[in-house]
Amino acid sequence: MATHKQAVPPPTVFFGEEAFQPIDHTEVRWLGSGGMFVNTRGTCIMMDPMLKDFDMPLLIDMPIAPENIPHLDAVLITHCDNDHYSVPSLHAMEHVSKAFHGPHYVAELMQAEGFPANGHTIGDSFEIGPAKITLTPADHAWQNEKAKYNYRVFRLEDYCGFWIETPDGIIWAPGDSRLMKEHLEMPQPDVILFDFSDNEWHIGLEGAIQMANTYPEAHLILCHWGTVDAPDLNVFNADPQSLYD
């Protein structure tokens, strides 16, 4: 029996082909969990889409089925955890995505699945349409503490965030990470996909508040909460109310 309550977001706002059309601005949508969809002037990018067949029960309906995605210019993957690198989701959309990007280790995993993935070093930049995308550092190598994963040593460079410069502003998704000093030394972004999980391998509540105060002009899109039905796991049970208390 669960011993903690779990915050649940409002009903899902579904979207379809209309969200992928050419537009004269940039739109950002939360996909649930740690995922994000960006349409910038008609260039369509998804990051960490976990849209089907997750191995735990969910609290919400996903806003779009991957089979209904008409086209993508790129899929970005921050790291190998299956709530971010969702192999079933990517297979369902591989025929409509022009490119897949991630850190080198994640790209190797994607290539093994048959995805035409591009691997990058932290700090590298590449362009997708009008968007310039740069990998930012992340500290999330929790696997090194688990015997199950001792087949390799997980390194900082296996995880990343994405800094996305669009014609209309800067979107930053730091990814799953402990708070790093580099996270507090970025230019002012316009939007942050904001993980506030109070977990030792995530930013932690105090770290999240520190980051929010460092970038007071940024709009915060809360993520990594209200998606997986796991009230006793602090990695999934963040509560937006805690940011106000």
Where are these regions (language model features)?
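Binuclear metal-ion centers of metallo-dependent hydrolases, dominated by the metallo-beta-lactamase
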Residues: 111-125, 129, 209, 213-245
